[in-house]
């Protein structure tokens, strides 16, 4: 049995667009207005998408159900396989007492929550995005900030927004590599174009984060830190993406930003230490709503731990960093893929759906159990368990409690990926994309919105580029705009959709202890997603028609 996708099931583009938007808007309605829990909103959206796919798009029931099930399985592996070991590793550090030492160490650097957020959420998170990606950075940094005493909502929300800067070059540049593969455009040209758009956002983001946390007046107190953090990151991101390609910008910019900020803190400190409400001057406990300010001539902190204790406490994150770097090496990745990958054709679904041009769509399930980022994190967690001093029985207890802690996030993520797969396979996303592509000369303005939508639905900039990259290139060519502008816009627009993707929300909520409060987290980030998206849309429109000198010179391959 085969079935061909349709873009205009109602034989009226406006009516088809309205129907296609129903399951997408349902997520916004459920989380913002009804304030549903994440798994409830995701299951509702998936059910609506199934009804639209079967009832309006005439997708066979069997194919629709298989597509939904395939998405849910993908949600379990590799996505949940990242979150489970990441939270397990963090819980080991808490149970062993290692995180208490880390908390005191962070306080010895600075107990100011604003600067802690810059170091961990922005800089360290960017480094992790460059090496691991796919949810791991948000899971790890949100857990760390919550453990340091951040308000859980702010910890998760700040990490989601901070993750905007590095997503385009995440996982050793895989989003741009995929964009190049599906469009035929040179990888370096796309990297250069993205590297001439995102650094402006990256430079402003640290200050934006601090304003979000503490307000404009208190943000001015740490303006030197925000400027050093943002400008060092943006400069390295721009240079590396333009001269080295997409593989290293996040890693180099993350390290450069951390080093620059630590150098600044050697001779500069904020005049006041800013903390969340209900924190005493020396507290590291969870905060509330009004900040506490205390004089900070010397930034008092807990007595520093002996170096050997500190090294032991940091060993889980050192192991994590080293293993993730090793896992990211191309030669290692190739060997792991060759040794430990099982690929299955999805029964009843593989090549059963034809795209609008009549080409069969392959549905393969890839179980790369060795090269998966989650495997690297689990290896680091097991090494950390061995070094933690916990007995195996205690480690097992930590693992089972982690599973219990993540039971609803796992359900949420499975439902979100089920939703993503059914709206893609049924053609619902193509209907929405086609409407945006019909905007003519204004298409460059809407091009980032397409990437934003793709990441909102799939939770992945890589998937959004695979989904819409070719459409972006062909539409740009048809209106006389350089296709590298709109393909790069798809990448750049996608990064600001990540913070509101239900998949990302579920990951951050699980790591930050906000299970059941996903709607609060969604409302926390959604406004900022739209603000940053509007900035990128205006930038891309200007690049397409006004600042054409920003477009890199490259040899145009034929689109395929």
Regions found by a protein language model. Give the residues of each.
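Membrane-embedded alpha-helical segments and adjacent helix-loop junctions characteristic
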Residues: 65-151, 157, 389-475
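Juxtamembrane and boundary regions of transmembrane helices in multi-pass small-molecule transporters
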Residues: 168-281, 492-560
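Hydrophobic mid-bilayer segments of alpha-helices in multi-pass membrane transport proteins
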Residues: 19-28, 36-58, 80-87, 226, ...
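Alpha-helical transmembrane segments of multi-pass membrane proteins
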Residues: 114-126, 152-165, 186-203, 414-415, ...
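Interfacial loop-to-helix junctions that mark the boundaries of transmembrane helices
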Residues: 6-16, 35-41, 65-77, 188-196, ...
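Juxtamembrane helix-boundary/capping and inter-helix hinge elements in multi-pass membrane proteins
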Residues: 35-36, 94-99, 111-112, 145-154, ...
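Structural signature of hydrophobic alpha-helical transmembrane segments
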Residues: 8-22, 75-79, 131-137, 188-203, ...
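Transmembrane helical segments that form the transport core of multi-pass membrane transport proteins
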Residues: 292-295, 301-450
């Amino acid at each position: 049995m085969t079935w061909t996708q349709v873009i205009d099931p109602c034989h009226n583009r406006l009516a088809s667009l309205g129907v296609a938007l129903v399951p997408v808007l349902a997520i916004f309605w459920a989380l913002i207005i009804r304030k549903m829990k994440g798994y409830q909103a995701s299951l509702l959206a998936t059910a609506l998408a199934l009804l639209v796919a079967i009832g309006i798009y005439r997708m066979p029931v069997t194919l629709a159900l298989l597509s939904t099930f395939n998405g849910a399985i993908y949600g379990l592996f590799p996505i949940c396989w990242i979150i489970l070991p990441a939270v397990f590793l963090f819980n080991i550090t808490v149970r062993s007492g290692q995180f208490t030492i880390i908390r005191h160490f962070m306080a010895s650097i600075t107990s100011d929550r604003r600067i802690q957020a810059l170091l961990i959420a922005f800089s360290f998170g960017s480094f992790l995005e460059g090496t691991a990606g796919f949810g791991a950075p948000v899971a790890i940094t949100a857990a760390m900030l919550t453990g340091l005493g951040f308000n859980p909502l702010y910890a998760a929300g700040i990490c989601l927004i901070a993750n905007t800067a590095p997503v385009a070059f995440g996982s050793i540049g895989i989003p741009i590599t995929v964009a190049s593969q599906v469009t035929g455009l040179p990888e370096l040209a796309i990297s250069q174009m993205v590297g001439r758009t995102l650094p402006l956002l990256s430079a402003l983001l640290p200050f934006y984060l601090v304003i979000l946390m503490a307000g404009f007046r208190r943000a001015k107190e740490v303006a030197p830190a925000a400027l050093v953090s943002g400008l060092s990151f943006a400069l390295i991101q721009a240079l590396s993406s333009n001269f080295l390609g997409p593989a290293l910008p996040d890693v180099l910019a993350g390290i450069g930003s951390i080093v620059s900020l630590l150098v600044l803190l050697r001779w500069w400190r904020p005049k006041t230490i800013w903390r969340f409400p209900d924190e005493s001057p020396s507290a590291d406990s969870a905060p509330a709503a009004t900040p506490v300010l205390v004089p900070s001539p010397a930034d008092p902190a807990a007595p520093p731990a002996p170096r050997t204790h500190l090294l032991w406490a940091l060993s889980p994150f050192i192991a994590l960093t080293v293993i993730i770097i090793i896992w990211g090496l191309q030669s290692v990745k190739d060997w792991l893929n060759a040794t430990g990958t099982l690929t299955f054709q999805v029964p009843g679904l593989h090549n059963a759906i034809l795209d609008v041009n009549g080409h069969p769509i392959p549905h393969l399930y890839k179980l790369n159990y060795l090269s998966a980022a989650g495997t690297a994190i689990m290896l680091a967690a097991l090494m950390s368990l061995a070094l933690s001093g916990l007995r195996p029985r205690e480690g097992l207890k930590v693992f089972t409690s982690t599973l219990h802690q993540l039971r609803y996030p796992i359900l949420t993520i499975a439902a979100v990926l089920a939703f993503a797969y059914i709206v893609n396979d049924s053609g619902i996303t193509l209907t929405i994309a086609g409407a945006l592509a019909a905007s003519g000369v204004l298409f460059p303005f809407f091009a980032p919105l397409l990437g934003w939508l793709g990441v909102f639905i799939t939770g992945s900039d890589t998937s959004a580029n695979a989904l819409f990259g070719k459409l972006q290139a062909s539409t740009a060519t048809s209106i006389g705009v350089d296709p590298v502008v709109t393909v790069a816009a798809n990448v750049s627009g996608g990064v600001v959709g990540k913070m509101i993707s239900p998949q990302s929300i579920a990951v951050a909520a699980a790591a930050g202890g906000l299970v059941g409060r996903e709607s609060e987290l969604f409302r926390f980030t959604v406004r900022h997603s739209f603000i940053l998206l509007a900035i990128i849309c205006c930038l891309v429109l200007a690049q397409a028609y006004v600042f054409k000198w920003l477009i890199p010179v490259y040899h145009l391959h034929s689109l395929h």
